[in-house]
Curated annotation (Swiss-Prot):
This is Chaperonin GroEL. It comes from the Bacteria. Its EC number is 5.6.1.7. Keywords: ATP-binding, Chaperone, Cytoplasm, Isomerase, Nucleotide-binding. Pfam families: Cpn60_TCP1. The gene is groEL. Gene3D superfamilies: GroEL, GroEL-like equatorial domain, TCP-1-like chaperonin intermediate domain. Forms a cylinder of 14 subunits composed of two heptameric rings stacked back-to-back. Interacts with the co-chaperonin GroES. GO terms for cellular component: cytoplasm. InterPro entries: Chaperonin_Cpn60_CS (IPR018370), Cpn60/GroEL (IPR001844), Cpn60/GroEL/TCP-1 (IPR002423), GroEL-like_apical_dom_sf (IPR027409), GROEL-like_equatorial_sf (IPR027413), TCP-1-like_intermed_sf (IPR027410).
Length: 542
């Protein structure tokens, strides 16, 4: 296929057109008075959202040159969401503002490479200033404030997220699911839960709930498949004498072995239940080790030279309570050594830091949560499916932003932190490097201006008042139209969101400004369908 090549100003101007179209669609969602964007879907009802990254992901432009610019900035929005969890709109607005200012200077004759150098130095200096003015998140109230801001000022969602983080800790897993009704709810599973249910309904002890509940049980863990009870008889006799319930977690338990256990359970000889081991392959081995450490058991595996026929009560784990339904098993109050659990948690944290796979990272974090706290499920309710999708987007955003705030701390919100940090930066640069730095120092006012503009206020007046005020925490509350102490008003942003948004925006704008040529496909006109040949008159017609 033939390619189209554009150079210098023509290339950059085409890219800028694409960036502008994407930014214009995304930036209207910004702030407490941001507008909705309606997205057509190939099937079903249109999707209404105020989530910047959801809007950006849907945009594909017809012009190939413009589309290249839009796709690069779309990537910035996605990367910011992946890394910081929020700040997609901020990153898009910043990238557009930096590119616009930079393009004007480069068209006027500035050296793109020196401009880029100055931009990088100014961006790094602003991030250092942001770190200086940030503060740690100390209590549940501040967590709720961050979550509320990210959820577009929805206090109910903010409080639910704060409650969830309070219950399961910062390493706990918090998931978002759709509720059956219209109300939002929080459900916390304390202890370790894994997605394996009882192997036979005959193990059920609570017929009303169809669950098997065990108090103070012993737990036998093996990676072997059990088909015969012959090897288990010695340890089962010891358990019967102790009078305690037994949970067997094995690779599988079937045939004669399962039938015999069910029979003993029904006769009241043994209070017993069995479940399959969670996970697959190497992950299964690691999860069995996790359960063993949590309960103080030894994993009976041939790899360590252990066999079921030699197992004793010392090899079994213990827990305060176990609840099993047809799909899940929950182990509460494992009696394992707390130092061993802490060491295992530290080991998994190192694996999380070192892994490059997002899937592996997610699974490791789930294991971490199960060992260190528990799992919280935020159930989001809404009257319609369209509202449900929009609300779920907001909860996901708020949850990610809250985790970012706990990680790195918070700064004043509403775009004011970037403006204040910019004002504090003093750089001694010359020539086009100074031009590049000035581009960044001016561009970081764009998010604050956009928030004010979306709320119907004069963006220039708002920016000027905040920039020239010496009060460190002063900002503009776009919801009320007042100038307030942002920390006291609870209008705060995670430092990580502001930092990542500025870094990513500077990076992509630098790439676009130093682009000297573009190569793209020539869009071919569709070939017209061939016309039908003339059939002539049909014979024999009168």
């Amino acid at each position: 296929m033939a390619k189209e090549i554009f150079f210098s100003d023509k290339a950059r101007n085409g890219l800028f057109e694409g960036v502008t179209k994407l930014a214009d669609a995304v930036k209207v969602t910004m702030g407490p008075r941001g507008r909705n964007v309606l997205i057509q879907k190939s099937f079903g009802a249109p999707h209404i959202t105020k989530d910047g990254v959801s809007v950006a992901r849907e945009i594909e432009l017809e012009d190939t040159l413009e589309n290249m610019g839009a796709q690069l900035v779309k990537e910035v929005a996605s990367n910011t969401a992946d890394e910081a969890g929020d700040g997609t709109t901020t990153a898009t607005v910043l990238a557009h503002s930096i590119f616009k200012e930079g393009l004007r200077n480069i068209t006027a004759g500035a050296n793109p490479i020196e401009v880029k150098r100055g931009m990088d130095k100014a961006s790094a200096a602003i991030i250092e200033e942001l770190k200086k003015i940030s503060k740690e998140v100390k209590d549940k109230k501040e967590i709720a404030q961050v979550a509320t801001i990210s959820a577009n000022s929805d206090e109910t969602i903010g409080n639910l997220i704060a409650e969830a983080m309070d219950r399961v800790g910062k390493d706990g897993v918090i998931t978002v699911e759709e509720a059956k009704g219209i109300n939002d709810d929080l459900e916390v599973v304390e202890g370790m839960q894994f997605d394996r249910g009882y192997l036979s309904p005959y193990f059920v002890t609570n017929t009303e709930k169809m669950t098997c509940e065990m108090e103070n049980p012993l737990i036998l863990i093996t990676d072997s498949k059990i088909t015969s009870l012959k090897d288990l008889i010695p340890v089962l006799e010891q358990i019967q004498q102790s009078g305690r319930p037994l949970l067997i977690i094995s690779d599988d338990l079937e045939g004669e072995a399962l039938a015999t256990l069910v029979l003993n359970r029904l006769k009241g000889v043994l209070n017993i239940a069995a479940v399959k081991a969670p996970g697959f392959g190497d992950r299964k081995k690691e999860m069995l080790k996790d359960i063993a450490i949590l309960t103080g058991a030894n994993v009976i595996t041939e790899e360590l030279g252990l066999s079921l026929d030699k197992a004793t009560l010392d090899d079994l784990g213990q827990a305060g309570r176990v609840v099993i339904d047809k799909d899940n098993t929950v182990i509460v109050d494992g009696k394992g050594d707390s130092a061993a659990v802490d060491a295992r948690v530290a080991e998994i944290k190192i694996q999380v830091e070192n892994t490059t796979s997002e899937y592996d990272k997610e699974k490791l974090q789930e294991r971490l949560a199960k060992l260190s706290g528990g799992v919280a499920v935020i159930k989001v309710g809404a009257a319609t499916e369209t509202e449900m999708k929009e609300k779920k987007d907001r909860v996901d955003d708020a949850l990610s932003a809250t985790k970012a705030a706990v990680d790195e701390g918070i700064v004043i919100g509403g775009g004011a932190a970037l403006a204040k940090a910019s004002k504090a930066v003093k750089l001694d640069l010359e020539h086009d490097e100074a031009v590049g730095a000035e581009i960044i120092l001016r561009a970081v006012y764009a998010p604050m201006k956009q928030i004010a503009q979306n709320a119907g206020f004069d963006a220039g007046v708002v920016a000027d008042k905040i920039a020239n005020n010496s009060e460190a925490n002063l900002g503009f509350n776009a919801a009320t139209g007042e100038y307030v102490n942002m920390l006291e008003a609870g209008i705060i942003d995670p430092l990580k969101v502001a930092r990542v948004a500025l870094q990513n925006a500077t990076s992509v704008a630098s790439l676009l400004l130093t682009t000297e040529a573009t190569v793209s496909d020539i869009k071919e006109a569709p070939t017209p369908a061939p016309t039908m040949p003339d059939m002539g008159g049909m014979p024999g017609m009168m």
